[in-house]
């Protein structure tokens, strides 16, 4: 551990102790997975390379995801498949559902992809990123996922991208058997969701989701984070940086040497 911190001190620009403490607070946690709670999940291709080149690749990936999520009891609330990365909103119903689904899906897809390429190699860049979402951030997270093609300038409206859950959420004629729609249907109508997507995202909303996904910390109210700390028996809220303050002497007697 000392060697790791020493290496971090050497490689981080020396702007002062506060910057170093900020880095430690932003460091990625061991993965936090909470059963029956929504999570945002994302993973990129190795070195941001294209890993989905055509519709055949997209159909193959989504079919593998469907099979694996059913096998490992993972509900899929939303998704967006891009050329070099994927975003998911999922609910794991067992402790291993999320990791097993991604491992199974991405392992099988890597074999499929490498079989089509002149040279085989790593397809996915490291392990996937994820963060738990409370109910108030679930829908903002789903909107962020479905607006990916709009932010990338590929379409003008989310529902125009056929390789995401937006098509099913915005068009009553589209049926997507991969999706768990019960919770969405209780909260939204097609017209209401279209309006919510069209309203767009705030910069703070996007920043918070990206930060929590990168670090693995839950995105939600302080009560939500505290409840997850009780459930997981782990510190999940960011720790305050800097050295702990020395306790102040309450009286002159506190400063006197002890005499037996």
PLM region descriptions:
Residues 1-82, 91-260:
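Short Pro-Cys-Gly-centered "Cys-loop" motif that presents a nucleophilic cysteine in a tight turn
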